[in-house]
Amino acid sequence: MPPLIESVVLQPLIAPIDPGFDGRRSRRIERRSFARIKDAIDLPLLIETQLKSFEWFKREGLRELFDEISPITDFTGKNLELHFREYTFGEPRYDEFECRDRDLTYAAPLRVKVELRILTTGEIKESEIFLGDFPMMTDNGTFVYNGAERVVVSQLIRSPGVYFKDEKDPTSGRALHTAKLIPNRGAWLEFETNKRDVISVKVDRKRKIPVTILLRAISAWIANEDGSGRWAPDNELDKYGHNEHLIELFRHVDTVAEHLYIQATIDKDPSHNAKEALLELYKRLRPGDPPTLENARTLIESLLFNPRRYDLAKVGRYKLNKNLWERDARRDGPKAPDLSVRVLLPRDIFRIVEQMILLNNGYGRPDDIDHLGNRRVRTVGELIQQQFRVGLLRLERVVKERMSLQDPASATPNGLINIRPVVAAMREFFGGSQLSQFMDQTNPLAELTNKRRLSALGPGGLSRDRAGFEVRDVHHSHYGRICPVETPEGPNIGLIGTMSTFARVNEMGFLETPYRKVYNSIDNAQVWREKGILLRDVRDLRTGDLIAAKGTRVDDQIARQITIGLLRGQILREDVVDPNTGELIAEAGTEINRALAERIVNLPMKQIKIRPVVSQEVDYLSADEEDRFVIVQANAPLDEHNRFLDTTVSCRFGEDFVTERVERVDYMDVSPKQVVSVSTSLIPFLEHDDANRALMGSNMQRQAVPLLRPDAPIVGTGMEYRTARDSGQVVVARRDGVVVSATGNRIIVEEDDGKRTEYRLRKFMRSNQDTCINQRPSVVRGQQVRAGDVIADSSSTDQGELALGQNVLVAYMPWEGGNFEDAILVSERLVREDIFTSIHIEKYEVEARDTKLGPEEITRDIPNVGQDSLRNLDERGIIYIGAEVQPNDILVGKITPKGETDLTAEERLLRAIFGEKAREVKDSSLRVPNGVRGKVIDVKVFSRSEGAELPVGVNQTVRVLLCQKRKISAGDKMAGRHGNKGVVSRVLPMEDMPFLPDGRPVDIILNPIGVPSRMNIGQILETHLGWAAARLGFRVATPVFDGAHEDQIKDLLVQAGLPADGKVTLYDGRTGEKFDHPVTVGYAYMLKLAHLVEDKIHARSTGPYSLVTQQPLGGKAQFGGQRFGEMEVWALEAYGAAYTLQEMLTVKSDDVVGRVKTYEAIVKGEPIQEAGVPESFKVLIKELQSLGLSVEVLSADEKPVELSDDLDSDIGALEGINLSGMERGEF
């Protein structure tokens, strides 16, 4: 035995952190930051996308829809016209708290003013119509729908517009190009080139036709620049669309003699002019219908030129212009149509064919469909608008039908409008859409991530079966827009992503990311004068002071002022020479003072070249805008005046990483963390972790269950406060003021204007995932708060910071094989001191309904139940709050009338003699499920008689909330933030854990073999830094890609009086002997994940059986058995365990008679009889017989064996012994 270790005074884990709290200002955790780069801008509100989008829908989206559908006319268009005018939202009937309690939808009444015009008399009838209760978004970006919080996830889809793609011809190897014209709503046009140089088109996915047929037909449509148009008169149709006309139109592009595309297509085209082409097109699109000129024109107009049937949307027109009209550098060419033109123009289609010919001839490049310039985000407002449009179109159909049936003179708006289609459309969307999701509320981070998610799935998107590798892969255009790390593992990988920290969605739906503008030259006064009005603020490049505000009209004086302000303090990159006299004004390298700036501003030169300087100006760029610029990363070294220290820097240009001279740089990243999502930016030392493990770390943080006493991490990244604040789970002060009262369930703040605001706290509320939401005040009476301060913590926050786990002392060492294969050994201290204890709240509900035999009743008077089982029920038959319950205890007593069919002959006789008194009832009480125990914390009763809104046929609903306190135990899943996950294998007594030289036992033992192959070294650096910071009594922030370096960690370890390598000799707690080698020890932040052993463990002896095969059901939810499959049978065969195998396949499974007799034999202690015929064998024979095969079963002596066809003959054997927990009538 080694000598006893001398006693050492234990230093506290973390010294109390006091940020100079004087009772007046808000207390916040202070962190020592290792960041060297300051973010150029603050993080935006992290749920801004959701809030802004819904606001847009309320303000503009609905207005667009009503304008689109107005006026609704009758089928003749001569009698009635219905116009939708202004609309208003009323006040919601209940607030969000009540809606959650009562299982209602948080919604506001939508009313719209409607005007009915009777065209025959000129009379106008006005009325205000109620269009249903419209679900409203809460301040946290969620919807409360039927009592549950839901989130509408943004959808990432292919943007409307035209896309060019190349496909190799397998025989010749030539690149043949195709084009797809995708509208927001309406018919698709798909163009393709074949190897014989014929260009064909598919209209609305119908048959292929030569493109010249379409070109000839639309050449007769005379379009105006606003999108409206008309057909050429009948007698002139012959003059349009001749061969010479078509060849002339494409002469400038169709220039390769070996491949004359238009001529090859004309040769395949049976028509010769617009008239013939219209008829031919109609024949191809509507085969079987008689082709007339009128029908053909109506069809083409409705397919391509009618705004009610074809809509490119503003974004579609923007992409079309960009791809067709702005690709071409010719200045003298036709101008692009206006963005308000949302239908096709004939020249768009001609231009697509032109572009295809150019691509086929080797000019230009096809589009990259996975580029974010070609994919846009449909946010919540647009998704709701789309669904509301469906409802309005259904309503329009109803209105038109009613208009044709009613007398115009007596028609009223109320009589014409039926709101049911609109209400049903919204119910479909919020209740059943793939994009309206039950919010992940496990912890605040899960909630926030759910609101920032981008899904490529859903209506109009991809399906996970058909999505290939390319669409799932990380693309260079994702930089700063979509996180390259955070995505699910499994079939949805790459199809579901998360917005990066600084990303936002622009008005077109494209993702943008911010960059700091780099100035290489300054515009002289005459250039500023030409700009007329300033479109942005102009600020001093050194100080950031305002020189001229946005919207200022630029005259001579202001233009001079701007140029001088920007030039002052800058260094010239080239000599400045007066163009008129040739006089040298200043040499390169001169710093510009005011006098020099005033001389330069008078020179007749447009730009002054300066040494590049990174300004405070921030531009948000979309992916296709970014491709034109050279962008340097945020870590490029700058001096105190924001000039580059190096002459060349590493930059991004398009998809390439290049080294460029600083003069060529256009922009700089605003922050090192702008690449990743919020969840990923919470991983310290992310840059030292392999991407696969970082992905797991990001995903597992969202699964961390809230613990009893939240503890913010010692080693954070500085993102903890903002994440918690914007998640919606903490309470944030709306305005500045002073706290006048702070109790457990409410905080009252007196604002500066004397008005008092009350903040209600959520106490022990159940989340969607059965975790506990409990808000606690983090302010005291008399404390000053500012708008945006966190005034109450939630279950996973600590002083306003995200706190998903606990700081624990870990050692990386093997221990008796207990941490083999990533298993985790934990100390009993974590159990005893409730360090990893979590609260879980489960909801149980029972309804008393009207049945055919009479109403169900909630009562204490339950047949065949002893007094002991009723001890916790009140006089109503409902369990009281505070009762501790075990599996199978009654929560709510309920009886259901029994049907006549259930009565025996004796019972029917008694019924006939005594009447209703003898009426039998069945016990249908709500009981605690198997494996569940806990304490009742809330009971709610909703009765129709008391005015509660209940579903049809329900008289009363009782809801019971059961609370469980779960300590950490063997089988629970734990993880760090670096993807280092494992299952607790054993809880060791504190005295058996290895201990430090000062006598302190470690809390957790992790396996060192789990580190090298996983390449997540971040966990080791976190452990070292955590130990040093804990000893020195402060918390640290080590931001991603800008965190602490190895030498800084070593210095801190030495400063804390710890070994520089972070390793220490440990002693075995059982023997007191030293371990052979020093061990890495330190404080790591560990999470307990939502995969708890208590939810997973399950055992069955007898239980329910499948109806057809009579085999036990599967899964814990069905109280199922363990499947003994084909491979397991092979294993027993290999051992020759014949009797065990026979039992498995018969009495333990589907030998119906045998299993009852076996059960009986075991109970009575008799020998077990031989097994019978399994039910699945009978099923197999029946299946073979159903194929028309005559199948007989013969015994060993070749005599036929009779197999009973149904269970009736076996039921005699089942009398008295119920293996399944079913009533006899339920077989």
From Swiss-Prot:
GO terms for molecular function: DNA binding; DNA-directed RNA polymerase activity; ribonucleoside binding. One of its GO terms (biological process) is DNA-templated transcription. It holds the Pfam family RNA_pol_Rpb2_2. CDD domains: M23_peptidase, RNA_pol_B_RPB2. One of its GO terms (cellular component) is DNA-directed RNA polymerase complex. It is an enzyme of class 2 (transferase). It comes from the Bacteria. Belongs to the RNA polymerase beta chain family. DNA-dependent RNA polymerase catalyzes the transcription of DNA into RNA using the four ribonucleoside triphosphates as substrates. The RNAP catalytic core consists of 2 alpha, 1 beta, 1 beta' and 1 omega subunit. When a sigma factor is associated with the core the holoenzyme is formed, which can initiate transcription. This is DNA-directed RNA polymerase subunit beta. It comes from Chloroflexus aggregans (strain MD-66 / DSM 9485). The gene is rpoB.
